From Swiss-Prot:
Protein name: Large ribosomal subunit protein uL1
Annotated SUPFAM superfamilies: Ribosomal protein L1
Pfam families with a match to the protein in the record: Ribosomal_L1
Subunit structure as annotated in this protein's UniProt entry: Part of the 50S ribosomal subunit.
NCBIfam families: rplA_bact
């Protein structure tokens, strides 16, 4: 068994794994142990009361966090004509059609999000084996296949996050950075939970949001008392 580092021992001693912390206290605990040489991300895990084996109970979507994620997002857009001009004006980093597809086929993938107008999906569809495994394939369910590409670019640039439950029915995503204020992190988390509640499948029974835990990149998870949200 691997030995615990000093930091891991300190975290283990300082975090009560049996306790659900009031949100401000939870954030304070995270910040206390966010001592890496880089600004750590603050991540959240939300356990949902769904049966992920049933396709009609899977949860997937996107929402814009009020305070963003703290990271710069590079956006590639597949579109043409007036939409291409609008995408560039909105801040897209890469805009094109077949020319952009050729870049991607060559392995040039310097972007974090791919957006496409519906008429461009004939081109994007050829890139499924490249974009799919990386979670980059545009999808209308998360707003990345849309006729309004300019709005989608603005959303991506302003802190939109995409979420999707894993095989255990858990949502994993980022709600900011460790240098965000307690208020910013709390409001970002609240925005995510509001979006998840709106996305609750009609077939899901019982308690929908069962557990919420937050953590930093190098830190331990801290359970959050939902009543404090």
């Amino acid at each position: 068994m691997a030995k615990l580092t000093k930091k891991m021992k300190a975290i283990k001693a300082g975090v009560d794994s049996t306790k659900a912390y009031e949100i401000n206290e939870a954030i304070a605990v995270l910040k206390q142990f966010a001592t890496a040489k880089f600004v750590e991300s603050v991540d959240v895990a939300v356990n949902l009361g769904i049966d992920p084996r049933k396709s009609d109970q899977n949860v997937r979507g996107a929402t814009v966090l009020p305070h963003g994620t703290g990271r710069e997002v590079r956006v590639a857009v597949f579109t043409q004509g007036a939409n291409a001009d609008a995408a560039k004006e909105a801040g897209a980093d890469l805009v094109g059609m077949e020319d952009l597809a050729e870049q991607i086929k060559k392995g040039e993938m310097n972007f974090d999000v791919v957006i496409a107008s519906p008429d461009a999906m004939r081109v994007v569809g050829q890139l499924g084996q490249v974009l799919g495994p990386r979670g980059l394939m545009p999808n209308p369910k998360v707003g990345t296949v849309t006729p309004n590409v300019a709005e989608a670019v603005k959303n991506a640039k302003s802190g939109q996050i995409r979420y999707r439950n894993d095989k255990n029915g858990i949502i994993h995503t980022t709600i900011g950075k460790a240098n965000f204020s307690e208020v910013q992190l709390k409001e970002n988390l609240q925005a995510l939970l509001v979006a998840l509640n709106k996305a609750k499948p009609t077939t899901a029974k019982g308690i929908f949001i069962k557990k919420v835990s937050i953590s930093t990149t190098m830190g331990a998870g801290v359970a959050v008392d939902q009543a404090s949200l």
